[in-house]
Swiss-Prot record:
It comes from the Bacteria. It comes from Shewanella sediminis (strain HAW-EB3). Pfam families: DUF134. HAMAP family: UPF0251. Belongs to the UPF0251 family. This is UPF0251 protein Ssed_3913.
Length: 96
């Protein structure tokens, strides 16, 4: 049985719902879903340049979990860019 998921504090607002290649209708694209906590980790780690320890504390999670979320988010973004997929962003700010 997996451990219960810990509540994560999220603060970043998402400016749009999707990034996709120009000229290709979204119905024809493979979609990659970026979760809200992955978006927050990407924002804190790469945009705000916070250390993993500080960013993890802000989100209310362990440093290891933050690192895992950041790695997952980076992989999804890189895959979407290099393979021409649509990147679907979270739309509701929620505590999960």
């Amino acid at each position: 049985m997996p451990r219960p998921r810990k509540c994560r504090r999220l603060s970043a607002c998402v400016p749009c719902s999707m990034f996709k290649p120009n000229g290709i209708p979204s119905v024809e694209l493979t979609k990659i879903q970026l979760e809200a906590d992955e978006f927050e980790a990407l924002n804190l780690g790469d945009v705000e340049k916070m250390s993993q320890l500080d960013a993890a504390a802000r989100m209310g999670i362990s440093r290891q979990t933050f690192g895992n979320l950041l790695a997952s988010a980076r992989k999804k973004v890189a895959t979407a860019i290099t393979r021409g997929h649509a990147l679907v962003l979270p739309q509701e700010r929620q505590e999960s």
